[in-house]
Amino acid sequence: TSNDFNTEGVKQFCHLLDSRQQADIFQQDLLHLYLNAQNELSTRALNTASIGAGATGVELAAELVTAKENFYKYGLNKIDPKKVKISIIEAADRILPALSQKVADHTMKQLSHFGIEVLTKHRVAKVDEDKIYFADGSNIEADLKVWAAGIKAPDVLTQLEGFEKDNIGRLKVFA
């Protein structure tokens, strides 16, 4: 289950990717974003943001690069792929904290090559319909936002007694 850390606006304005149904809704909203932009009189920049730079956030951003190119190829050509900004936002000082520094460094080079903006050391304080606000007072615009910043155990596990749990409520398993 996603852990929003009680960040204001996440539940209302961010997509979660905990289930196939949530992923399908994200896909539909991404397509609607492009279709609506295609039908606007003036072209504008589209901004997407993945909040969280673990495996989910990084992979999603990379897939959005392919998606923007495919949308253009398949007829949504009023939207210049160069005007589609893809951002990854991470509170920690680097991406992919569960992996080695070498893997993170290589991935950063690839993300840069794809034109993905990576903001590390940016803790999200609040999200609204149009923007993501950071603890330092700065903000960025984002039409479509995905919260991939952390996980926690399902709430049902809090009711289980007699089992040892870690700091985010997951059951400890001893093999």
PLM region spans:
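Short amphipathic alpha-helical segments
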Residues: 5-9, 62-63, 100-101, 157-161
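FAD-site-proximal beta/loop scaffold in flavoenzymes
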Residues: 13-39, 131, 140-144, 148-175
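Rossmann-like dinucleotide-binding cores of NAD(P)H-dependent redox enzymes
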Residues: 63-122
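Short, well-ordered coil/turn residues at beta-beta hairpins
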Residues: 1, 135, 148-149
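Glycine-rich dinucleotide-binding loop and its adjacent helix/turn
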Residues: 3-56, 63-70
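A conserved short coil-to-beta-strand element within the FAD-binding core of flavoproteins
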Residues: 120-133
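Short, flexible hinge/linker loops that cap or flank conserved catalytic cores
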Residues: 40-42, 80, 139
